[in-house]
């Protein structure tokens, strides 16, 4: 018989840097999950990813306090900031442009995010990423 799902917990945790401090500890502690077991498993799964990159994770907690988790790709905004070499987006994206990204970089980000995005093809996903770039005050060249 399948296990009964108790809760879904969605978090963003830095790759390879999960530890019992907030936000991981309180979110999983409320569900009665072994926090250190999750931290070790998450860090092992994300060791190949650049350390410190925020990784969205969906943790499924079962009624017997066991869990499974699925990692997603980093948010598009984080990948765009990294590609443009900036710390943060523009506070006024329509007026202040804070950086530039090329179409090749946008395509690379779209291909990276392909597993998590619902776009039917790479061009549709690129348009979505370009929209995110524009809302951050980035100029897409090419």
UniProtKB/Swiss-Prot annotation:
Keyword Protein biosynthesis belongs to the record = no
* Keyword RNA-binding annotated: yes
Gene Ontology cellular-component annotations: cytosolic large ribosomal subunit
Q: Which Pfam families does the record associate with it?
A: Ribosomal_L11, Ribosomal_L11_N
- One annotated GO molecular function: large ribosomal subunit rRNA binding
Q: How is it modified after translation?
A: One or more lysine residues are methylated.
Question: Which keywords does UniProt give here?
Answer: Methylation, Ribonucleoprotein, Ribosomal protein, RNA-binding, rRNA-binding
Q: Which Gene Ontology biological process is one annotated for this entry?
A: translation
Question: Quaternary structure?
Answer: Part of the ribosomal stalk of the 50S ribosomal subunit. Interacts with L10 and the large rRNA to form the base of the stalk. L10 forms an elongated spine to which L12 dimers bind in a sequential fashion forming a multimeric L10(L12)X complex.
Task: Please explain the role this protein plays, according to its UniProt record.
Answer: Forms part of the ribosomal stalk which helps the ribosome interact with GTP-bound translation factors.
The text of the family note is: Belongs to the universal ribosomal protein uL11 family.
The name this protein carries in UniProt is: Large ribosomal subunit protein uL11
This chain's source organism reads Yersinia pestis
Name of the encoding gene: rplK
